């Protein structure tokens, strides 16, 4: 099986990993408890009153998307947390994605959501997933918010099918990027074509989280299944058991972080089953292509995809291949 092929050599570490995980959870719980004690202690912040903090949210009329459930969550937070600076910070940061970076529409009667990073008019598969993930818990209170997230899933599906090796895309399929001179298979509608393994994992994480919260399988149609098959194909290609695969990347640049050695495919690896990632989540080129955290992420994501494929599409062959 695919997953076993990657990580059989790491099974013996499971007990150690469980121990580290438990110790980490205990430490995190202790730190969280201390932070909550501080938050509720009424300790004076650097400002004297809540009114002295600047308002940085857009005016209501200029916000890209409005969610009553999110506004309610902000109000509840302010009622329960006494520290005014934390309340101010949460009230400005938590809704920022909805206020400033999402653009909801419908295409062919289906939700379609374009999510920019904030400073660049482009949608990263990784960033967009992480930007909306905190809102999953509020979908049951706000059906429009749920449709917005369905739109993100639909958009990501279309992007993966367009080019699974690209990391960032435009809403406009005809738009050309400043990186169009990169030495790789650039297409219109693609902002950047840096292959990052985690970029293919994040959309699965979002889809799985949505499905578990709602039990709604409507976004997971034949196109979505095709996207999952595409992700699996890329993972197999980048195990590099039969050559370097179809992807390469070079850029004319003075910055080493954008330079991929060995003709744009990276340094050679011993094909042991791990998946190569040409770039890190930071968009910087890897020196050692076996990026271990992203490989762990891939195992978790492929397991999630397998569960969804088996239960939603009933394709047991693909479900087994994903494991």
Indicate where each model-derived feature is located:
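Acidic/His metal-coordination segments adjacent to aromatic residues that form catalytic metal sites
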Residues: 108-115, 176-194, 257-290
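N-terminal export signals
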Residues: 20-41
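Aromatic-rich carbohydrate-recognition surfaces in CAZymes
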Residues: 121-149, 153-256
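Internal amphipathic alpha-helical repeat/solenoid segments
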Residues: 98-124, 145, 188-189
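Well-ordered alpha-helical scaffold segments within catalytic/enzyme domains
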Residues: 69-82, 130-143, 202-217, 296-314
């Amino acid at each position: 099986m695919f997953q076993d092929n990657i990580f059989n050599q790491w099974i013996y570490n499971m007990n150690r990993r469980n121990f580290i995980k438990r110790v980490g959870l205990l430490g995190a719980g202790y730190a969280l408890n201390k932070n909550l004690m501080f938050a509720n202690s009424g300790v004076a912040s650097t400002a004297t009153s809540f009114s002295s903090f600047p308002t940085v949210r857009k005016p209501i009329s200029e916000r890209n998307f409005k969610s009553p459930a999110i506004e309610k969550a902000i109000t509840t937070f302010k009622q329960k947390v006494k520290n005014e600076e934390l309340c101010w910070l949460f009230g400005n940061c938590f809704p920022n994605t909805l206020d400033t970076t999402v653009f909801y529409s419908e295409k062919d009667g289906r939700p379609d959501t374009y999510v920019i990073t904030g400073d660049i008019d482009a949608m990263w598969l990784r960033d967009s997933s992480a930007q909306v993930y905190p809102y999953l818990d509020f979908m049951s209170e706000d059906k429009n918010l749920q449709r917005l997230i369905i739109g993100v899933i639909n958009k990501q599906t279309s992007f993966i099918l367009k080019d699974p090796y690209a990391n960032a895309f435009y809403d406009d399929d005809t738009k050309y990027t400043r990186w169009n001179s990169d030495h790789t298979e650039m297409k219109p509608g693609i902002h950047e074509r840096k292959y990052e393994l985690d970029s293919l994992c994040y959309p699965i994480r979002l889809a799985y989280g949505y499905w578990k919260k709602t039990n709604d399988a409507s976004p997971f149609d034949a196109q979505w299944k095709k996207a999952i098959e595409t992700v699996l194909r890329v993972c197999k290609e980048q195990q590099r058991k039969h050559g370097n695969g179809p992807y390469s990347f070079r850029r004319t640049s003075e910055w080493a972080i954008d330079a991929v050695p060995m003709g744009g495919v990276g340094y050679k690896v011993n094909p042991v089953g791990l998946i190569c990632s040409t770039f890190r989540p930071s968009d910087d080129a890897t020196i050692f292509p076996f990026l271990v955290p992203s490989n762990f992420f891939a195992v978790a994501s492929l397991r999630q995809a397998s569960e969804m494929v088996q239960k939603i599409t009933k394709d047991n062959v693909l479900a087994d291949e994903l494991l």
